[in-house]
Swiss-Prot record:
The protein's name: Lysophospholipid transporter LplT
Gene Ontology molecular function terms on file: lysophospholipid:sodium symporter activity
Alphabetical UniProt keywords: Cell inner membrane, Cell membrane, Lipid transport, Membrane, Transmembrane, Transmembrane helix, Transport
Gene giving rise to this polypeptide: lplT
Stored SUPFAM superfamilies: MFS general substrate transporter
Gene3D superfamilies: MFS general substrate transporter like domains
Length: 397
């Protein structure tokens, strides 16, 4: 825990392992807390329509604080920024444990997550460089997916046993993330001394948006990652209505198992990308993006469980192979132009706006009576065409 260190190019340095450990615990807590809080709301007889509002508040925090969190990450040592952000998550979980309105507590967690994201990705480019950055992103994505899987399951299982116990475990996990942050070396701030007045901060953020958008490589990365995560959150909701219609299974658990197959595939795809793609060969990931859309279309017409599981696993592999190189490209190019923290903050804004837009289109389709299978086919086709268009546009630029 030295006060100042130079970048260690080793992929498995103590600092890098501390970052991965902190990320696993933080993401585990996020997903476990969601299911534990939903169980609490059910126990307190909150109306069903109020449950999605939790996710909206979480996403809304990313959008609302996007102009500020990138500068926050770049103005201080990123390991300490991560610690403060996890402390906010701990505070939010603690509030829910002590009976504070769950929307207030979960909003605090969302603010912590918004502050955490630019720092957790930005620090990778400070701890390692070059092609190892792609591998570091693979480790980050793999640990995140593992945390999503285990956290979701743990939150649901513990909440079935005892809701308060589940909430306390979430708070303890966030506490563990805070402790893990202490082992991240205190690297120099990337951009110290920036103005903290509202107008200069917003001007700085939107200036970063313009800078990244004018650069062909970073624009390419921003559009690709936004499409991917917007599609990912939409697929999660699509599975809930698709399973009863296509498979005739009304269990609440089955959509969770199918989502788990996607997550496992992303881990495998992220590992493959770390070995096969470098910053100079990022375009290799684009066919995988097109195949994501094709896999969704093929999945939508399935009527039996085994092929559905297999296609979702394959979809996840394509997804992991697609997203990891794009993340690494944005971090590397953004670090030298607007700062890694600002680059990730801009990325978060794009991704969360894409989530809201895609969910809005999905909700509109469902509300006018489009069948789930048709929604899946249309969704997959639009995604494949969008990625293909992005690829062609990127090559021309």
């Amino acid at each position: 825990m030295s006060e100042s260190v130079h970048t260690n190019p080793s992929l498995y340095s103590k600092g890098m392992l501390a970052v991965i450990c902190a990320q696993f615990l933080s993401a585990f807590g996020d997903n476990a807390l969601l299911f534990a809080t939903l169980a609490l709301m059910k126990q307190l007889y909150y109306p069903e329509w109020s449950q999605p509002v939790l996710q909206m508040l979480f996403v809304g925090a990313y959008i609302l604080f996007a102009p500020f969190v990138g500068q926050f990450a770049d103005s201080f040592a990123k390991g300490r920024v991560m610690m403060v952000a996890n402390g906010l998550k701990l505070l939010g979980a603690g509030c829910i444990c002590f009976g504070v309105n769950p929307f207030i507590g979960y909003t605090l967690v969302g603010i912590g997550a918004a502050a955490y994201s630019p720092a957790k990705y930005g620090i990778l480019g400070e701890l390692t460089t070059g092609d190892k950055l792609v591998k570091a992103n693979g480790l980050m994505e793999s640990s995140t997916i593992a945390a999503i899987l285990l956290g979701s399951m743990a939150g649901g299982i513990l909440a079935d046993w005892h809701v308060l116990a589940a909430l306390i475990v979430c708070a303890l996990v966030y506490g563990g993330a805070v402790v893990a942050n202490l082992w991240i070396p205190r690297l120099p701030a990337a951009r110290p001394g920036q103005s903290w007045r509202f107008k200069p901060m917003t001007h700085s953020f939107f200036s970063a948006c313009r800078t990244l958008w004018r650069n062909g490589e970073t624009r390419f990365s921003l559009m690709g990652t936004s499409l991917f995560w917007g599609a990912g959150v939409t697929l999660r909701f699509l599975l809930v209505i698709w399973v009863p219609v296509a498979l005739g299974i009304t269990s609440n658990a089955m959509p969770t198992y199918l989502n788990a197959m996607v997550a496992v595939g992303i881990v495998l795809g992220a590992g493959a990308a770390a070995k096969l793609v470098t910053l100079e060969t990022v375009s290799r990931c684009m066919p995988a993006g097109i195949l994501i859309g094709i896999a969704v279309m093929a999945f939508a017409v399935q009527q039996s469980l085994l092929p559905a599981f297999g296609l979702l696993l394959l979809l996840g592999v394509f997804g992991g192979f697609f997203i990891v190189p794009l993340n690494a490209l944005l971090q590397e190019r953004g670090k030298h132009s607007v700062g890694a923290g600002n680059a990730i903050a801009v990325q978060n804004l794009g991704e969360n706006v894409a989530m809201l837009l895609m969910l809005g289109l999905y909700s509109l389709a469902v509300s006018v009576g489009v069948p789930p299978v048709a929604v899946g086919i249309g969704f997959g086709a639009v995604f494949a065409v969008a990625i293909a268009a992005l690829w062609v546009w990127g090559r021309r630029k």
